């Protein structure tokens, strides 16, 4: 992920952790090869939605250059207000 995108996620992490619904996004990210099965299992092992959200964002920040655009695309389908929030930061 590019540094400018990491910066956006870092600035918006509190909103993302509070509002993100990670479960519906996991299969989407898996289908796009953004995360692998081990990542999915690890994220799903957490009991709290907020912890799952935090771990997902932290993992995405370490992924390839398409991770940010895949996050925005996934959010546009599931939680468009979060996608708008990220795009406005950029």
Question: How should these model regions be labeled?
Answer:
Residues 1-15, 21-90:
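Alpha-helical death-domain superfamily interaction modules
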């Amino acid at each position: 992920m590019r540094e400018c995108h990491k910066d956006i996620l870092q600035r918006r992490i509190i909103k993302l952790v509070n509002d993100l619904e990670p479960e519906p996004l996991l299969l989407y990210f898996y289908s796009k090869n953004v995360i692998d099965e081990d990542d999915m299992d690890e994220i799903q092992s957490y009991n709290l939605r907020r912890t799952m959200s935090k771990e997902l964002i932290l993992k995405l920040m370490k992924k390839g250059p398409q991770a940010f655009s895949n996050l925005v695309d996934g959010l546009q389908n599931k939680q468009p207000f979060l996608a708008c929030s990220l795009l406005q930061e950029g």
